[in-house]
């Protein structure tokens, strides 16, 4: 009996060691980009980006554990920053809210506002957003956080819609409102996961954008929803588990507001079947039953193509930094060659690829208990400073060229060697 017990314990330990990936070592981020000057500006402000990222020793080398802990716990000893909630009534009669957090501490030379777009169904109350906001405030940045329509439990919807994967107008309304309040501020746009897609799409669409925008940062997005969903539909590596969680969260938001979203009038207008929505097992099923119908698309593929920033990024002229982790189980490694190639072929673009970090985790330090501030929080504050430095070095003529023309000088190809 003791031999059998020892064998069972040995098997369990082997499985745990494999899942936790504890034999892995800390690695330096790979840096892609051809614009040497732009990259050096970022690294000058944030030299630690050249150093190995050291996850929490016992579990931080597992992308699954990082992702799950991020979803369940968020951050260690999370602060609750105090901000002001702004409400806007949109032309479609929807109520859009965003929260503004002023910088704390001494006066700072530059007035910079970080405009944050959270992940799918997330808000200013999400734990990882609160931690990042507090850390940014302490470094002199004003923060504004978009609350996706329908995501806040205490805010009822007043129109006939909630947020969508590719609808950038809500983010644009927040930017416009911010500039009415702070007309001289410089803007750094930051997006997490789905928010990264929305920020990148907003900066790439053919639309008028304010000159106050000095750069953008995208974290852990998949770039192409068609490829991303095709990957998540596979059973290997717990992919369908993550897809089920995302589907259930999205459906819960719809059903929370079903008195409006699934009213008899809207069900008749869009051909909605409440039973199909309730029984949808995957996001493509739910998008077939609800999203593509209310947004007026013939197929789910058409909806995903319209929503994905990858199909717009050839128009991107704003300085941009992208961050992904190779062990991210949601924005998976096979999606990353696209952004590597993009960074290699465009100026004022930098791509950071980490071996570990999971989906929006990036916990660091300690043996079992992680540091309260993650590698990602530190990186985003540093990159924002680098974007400001790169912007301040440009002449007015160069600023105009950045917004209107694409340069073609090849400086670096492949991973940036530092």
Regions found by a protein language model. Name each.
Residues 12-43, 47-48, 180-295:
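Alpha/beta-hydrolase-fold enzymes
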Residues 56-109, 369:
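N-terminal cap/lid segment of alpha/beta-hydrolase-fold proteins
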Residues 90, 101-157, 173, 177-180, ...:
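Short, surface-exposed "cap/lid" segments of acyl-processing enzymes
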Residues 133-150, 342-365:
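Active-site machinery of serine-nucleophile hydrolases
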Residues 161-182, 201:
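Alpha/beta-hydrolase active-site loop
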Residues 289-312:
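Active-site nucleophile elbow and catalytic-triad environment of alpha/beta-hydrolase enzymes
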Residues 316, 322-324, 328:
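Short beta-strand/loop motif that positions the catalytic acidic residue
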Residues 355-357, 361-418:
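Catalytic active-site module of serine/aspartate enzymes centered on a nucleophile-bearing elbow/loop
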């Amino acid at each position: 009996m003791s031999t059998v017990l020892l064998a069972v314990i040995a098997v369990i330990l082997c499985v745990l060691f494999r899942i936790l990936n504890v034999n892995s070592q800390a690695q330096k981020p790979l840096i892609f980009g051809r614009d040497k000057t732009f990259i050096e500006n970022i690294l000058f402000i944030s030299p630690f980006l050249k150093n190995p990222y050291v996850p929490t020793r016992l579990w931080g080398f597992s992308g699954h554990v990082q992702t799950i802990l991020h979803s369940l716990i968020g951050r260690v000893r999370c602060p609750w920053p105090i901000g002001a909630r702004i409400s806007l009534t949109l032309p479609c009669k929807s109520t859009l809210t965003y929260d503004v957090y002023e910088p704390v501490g001494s006066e700072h030379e530059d007035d910079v506002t970080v405009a944050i777009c959270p992940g799918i169904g997330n808000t200013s109350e999400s734990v990882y957003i609160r931690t990042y906001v507090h850390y940014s405030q302490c470094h002199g940045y004003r923060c504004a956080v978009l609350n996706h329509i329908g995501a806040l439990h205490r805010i009822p919807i007043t129109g006939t819609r909630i947020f969508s994967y590719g609808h950038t107008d809500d983010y644009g309304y927040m930017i416009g409102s911010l500039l009415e309040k702070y007309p001289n501020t410089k803007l750094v746009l930051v997006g997490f996961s789905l928010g990264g897609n929305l920020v990148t799409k907003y900066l790439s669409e053919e639309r008028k954008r304010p000159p106050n925008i000095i750069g953008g940062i995208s974290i852990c997005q998949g770039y192409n929803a068609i490829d991303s969903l095709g990957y998540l539909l596979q059973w290997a590596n717990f992919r369908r588990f993550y897809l089920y969680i995302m589907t259930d969260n999205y459906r819960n938001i719809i059903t929370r507001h079903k008195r409006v979203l699934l009213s008899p009038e809207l069900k008749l207008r869009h051909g909605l079947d409440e039973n199909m929505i309730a029984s949808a097992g995957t996001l493509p099923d739910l998008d077939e039953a609800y999203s593509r119908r209310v947004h007026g698309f013939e197929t789910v593929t058409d909806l995903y193509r319209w929503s994905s920033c990858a199909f717009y990024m050839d128009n991107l002229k704003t300085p941009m930094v992208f961050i992904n982790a190779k062990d991210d189980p949601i924005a998976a490694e096979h999606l990353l060659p696209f952004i590597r190639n993009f960074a290699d072929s465009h100026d004022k673009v930098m791509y950071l690829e980490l071996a570990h970090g999971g989906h929006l985790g990036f916990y660091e330090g300690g043996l079992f208990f992680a540091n309260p501030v993650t590698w990602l929080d530190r990186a985003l504050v540093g990159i924002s400073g680098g974007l400001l430095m790169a912007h301040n070095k440009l002449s007015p003529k160069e600023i105009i060229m950045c917004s209107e023309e694409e340069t073609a000088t090849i400086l670096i190809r492949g991973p940036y060697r530092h």
